[in-house]
Amino acid sequence: MEKFEREIKESKFSELLNKHFAASAIPKGIHCLSLRLTDEYSSNAHARKQLPSPELLPLLSDNSYHHFVLSTDNILAASVVVTSTVQSSLIPEKIVFHIITDKKTYAGMHSWFALNPIPAIIEVKGLHQFDWLTRENVPVLEAVENHKGIRDYYHGNHIVGSNLSETTPHKFASKLQARSPRYISLLNHIRIYLPEMFPNLNKAVFLDDDIVVQRDLSPLWDIDLKGKVNGAVETCKGEDTWVMSKRFRNYFNFSHPLIAKNLDPNECAWAYGMNIFDLRAWRKKNIRDIYHFWLKENLKSNLTMWKLGTLPPALIAFKGYVHPIDPSWHMLGLGYQDKTDIEAVKKAAVIHYNGDSKPWSDIGFEHLRPVWTKYVDYSNDFIRNCHIMES
């Protein structure tokens, strides 16, 4: 019986590992879309037209508009975030989207939004176009990308060889999720530099690329953050005992003396993915420096303080600067919790497919995918030619 149980457990771990590798791969259709749109940028003047048009440029820093920031190299995901936000808005003409992408995706991303106009103001910028964003100003990120321990962490064989008898499938799944290569991408750390990247903005909502907006988000700008910097949904209380049971002890190694000395294991965690930031209040704090300090300390400790991811250093850096907002604004777990309540999904302002099972991937949960796919235009020539099919 013991042998049988061990085999079942090993089978479960193997399934989770395969799922992790599948989630890390770029689907062929999405890769094709990026390549074709990049080619279009080279050959089609319409794909290169200025975004936004010259007369609208002043609105990029107009604080009477609602500014959203999205950082991604996934063109299809970006289109869903933007389309769902605009279609759910009561005043789409007041929306400004600042889409940040990397150098290799820039041409394709620009092509998509130039050729598929929507009733909002769109700006597409590559990381290479931010003069401020140099290695001198963000030296820690070069260290993160080049650190041997991190390369081993993502590419070594120790994941497979870890002692499975000392963990559970639940914990193993969490560890794998933290091993996503996107966590060492500059695009994923970019949100910590919002005040410098957008020096004229007072407030902005930062959205992850694996979300869908289902409700008008303009009331977020009316929330009194009471002098705090980050309006976020807390994740330590709620009916879902897996998704909504996160405290600092779930993210940090409290056997490390620096962690034990500075943090409370019972402190409530909060979510990235849909955050309203008061950039004026943020500029008066040293949040970025704290973030850098703890990233460096974790590297020095050979990743023994936490197992990577961008949330742990943010939990420390924003400590004392978070204002909890109503949980209905942001529903989490659609990428790793297949038992998600569909009725609850319908009521949430923003649903978040955080986890491995992204709606654009083959391992997305079938019953949760239609909420995302309804914002994809499957009649679009580029999408059809890349064989991105509605499932």
Residue ranges and their predicted role:
Residues 1-391:
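Glycosyltransferase catalytic domains, chiefly GT-A lineage
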